[in-house]
């Protein structure tokens, strides 16, 4: 039960940090370059499944479970570099240069959850974040 409480607490803390970070970054972009966004509409079941189930499972396995498990077992001295590299690559696959920074930070946060609590909690945190983004 304590592990569940710790995992849920970590997910909520990371989620709060993500929302705050995102609001600060996008508010700054709105002010600096006049960036505007439109509310999301027409969320289909397939879009929901892709964003909130498939992507979190696949990305957490590909960017956290595989590289960090290998790093822990075989490359302990390079663990931090591998974690940062994985987070940067995670950001890179999400597109634009601004996404490399934003998603890279999320990758580091998901890595912390993975290391502290395990894969299921990292997937849950990632799914929660994607759900939040999908519904904004």
Put a short name on every predicted segment.
Residues 45-136:
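Transmembrane helix-loop-helix hairpins at the membrane interface
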Residues 1-55, 61, 68-74:
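Juxtamembrane helix-loop-helix connectors linking adjacent transmembrane helices
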């Amino acid at each position: 039960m304590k592990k569940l409480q710790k995992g849920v607490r970590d997910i909520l803390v990371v989620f709060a940090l993500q929302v705050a970070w995102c609001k600060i970054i996008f508010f700054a972009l709105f002010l600096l370059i006049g960036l505007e966004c439109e509310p999301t509409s027409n969320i289909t079941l397939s879009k929901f499944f892709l964003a909130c189930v498939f992507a979190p499972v696949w990305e957490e396995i590909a960017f956290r479970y595989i590289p960090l498990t290998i790093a822990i077992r075989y490359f302990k001295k390079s663990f931090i570099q591998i974690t940062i590299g994985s987070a940067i690559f995670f950001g890179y696959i999400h597109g634009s240069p601004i996404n490399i920074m934003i998603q890279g930070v999320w990758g580091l946060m998901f890595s912390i959850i993975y290391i502290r609590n395990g894969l299921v909690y990292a997937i849950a945190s990632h799914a929660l974040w994607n759900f939040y983004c999908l519904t904004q």
